[in-house]
Amino acid sequence: SRYGGLKQLDGLGPNGETIMDYSIFDAIKAGFGKIVFIIRKDFENDFREKILNKYEGHIPAELCFQSIDALPEGFTCPEGREKPWGTNHAVLMAKDVVNEPFCVINCDDFYNRDAFQVIGKFLSELPEDSKNAYAMVGFRVGNTLSENGTVARGICSTDEAGNLTTVVERTEIMRVNGPVCYKDE
């Protein structure tokens, strides 16, 4: 990666807090009561030592593993693939431990407490028999750019009622002399 390491484990706060620690703190303050971490198996020992151990006894936490060959029946991993499948696949890996309304984040992005409060409110107001109810907290792409290179983002469009209509993956997004630009594939 451009970063050159596992930024999920690198401390940046005054007491070594990670970006993930700030998100977990904000999520707990917003009313979330359980954490499910989805990681690669080869990352387990470091993750338990640096992250999971600090939450034991404070909030229920589960650990699931994402593997590129863990696929639904009828699917196979293309030969030579090394890169993880992504967020949807990670969520699939947690299907046996998530039985309640939930929120998904990436642990190397900072969201802020307001984001957790918004999604927490949505989830807490769902009727008990709710199925297939979804929401997302969106951010203006210009507020998510890096000063250290390009980023990839899902660019969302909505209808007049605020319903999500499309998500288009854009790569190599950056600011060029003011405006936000991306590579047109």
List PLM regions with ranges.
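Conserved core of the sugar-phosphate nucleotidyltransferase
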Residues: 113-185
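Structural beta-sheet core signal
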Residues: 37, 63, 104, 136-137
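Short glycine-enriched, charge-decorated loop/helix-capping segments at active-site entrances
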Residues: 6-13, 77-81, 151
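Short phosphate-binding loop-to-helix
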Residues: 55-101
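Short beta-strand-to-loop acidic/aromatic patch adjacent to the donor-nucleotide binding site
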Residues: 100-110
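N-terminal glycine-rich phosphate-binding loop and ensuing alpha1 helix
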Residues: 1-52, 59-61
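Residue-level signal for inorganic ion chemistry
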Residues: 20, 94, 108, 140
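Short, electropositive alpha-helical surface patch
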Residues: 46-58, 116-125
